[in-house]
């Protein structure tokens, strides 16, 4: 039975990844600092290590105590607005954490990593749909940190033979009702939970930035992927690498709906 390390496995997407891996018969080890994640969301993992990826001793202990066959990395700060006001926080956490993780992988002979990246690496796209070969020019530090990690992964493949699959996507949505996990951000920043809370009377109103886009209501088009589909894509990427697949970058996700429509149907 293979053992997979899920970095950031107590977060929204990471916890769904853990649940899916366990269901598919993998042993799972989780590393999370619990700054935005929740230990209660980690279901079925062999062990949850609470600590900072930038702590080399913490990672050395984790890799020494567990024979890790592959890594899936979700660990990152991800608020675009905050990244603009505090870019050093994002470079310090996201990039330095990834450097430390790759150093531990190299030291312990682990040669496969699935990196949860972002479509924010593209910035303002010149055309749609976006293709993996399109220009990458992030417009915020969050996207820039993810692109920096992608570039670092490319060089680590060439230098150390650590193969990677980087997955670029926009917005995750949904939950795994069977596993009893879902979105739990504090403060909540994702649009769909905010819309649902407004519909339930838990908020007075919802504000959406943008009013001059070429859409029926003037707001921008958002691309969504269900969180279980997203976890499935990360698992497929892991299996691709396990079969000897070459390092690459992949785009994920498409859902062209008005956010208000499913909310009305649920109501």
How should these model regions be labeled?
Residues 16, 37, 86, 104, ...:
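Generic structural signal for alpha-helix termini and adjacent loop/cap motifs
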Residues 1-175:
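N-terminal Rossmann-like NAD(P)+-binding domain of SDR-like oxidoreductases, especially those catalyzing
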Residues 257-267:
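Single conserved hydrophobic/aromatic residue that forms the stacking wall/gate
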Residues 170-173, 212, 256:
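Glycine-rich beta-alpha junction loops
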Residues 119, 225, 253-256:
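Structural/interface elements that position substrates and couple domains in central-metabolism enzymes
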Residues 147, 160-162, 174-193, 201-204, ...:
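Glycine/proline-rich active-site loop of Rossmann-fold NAD(P)-dependent oxidoreductases
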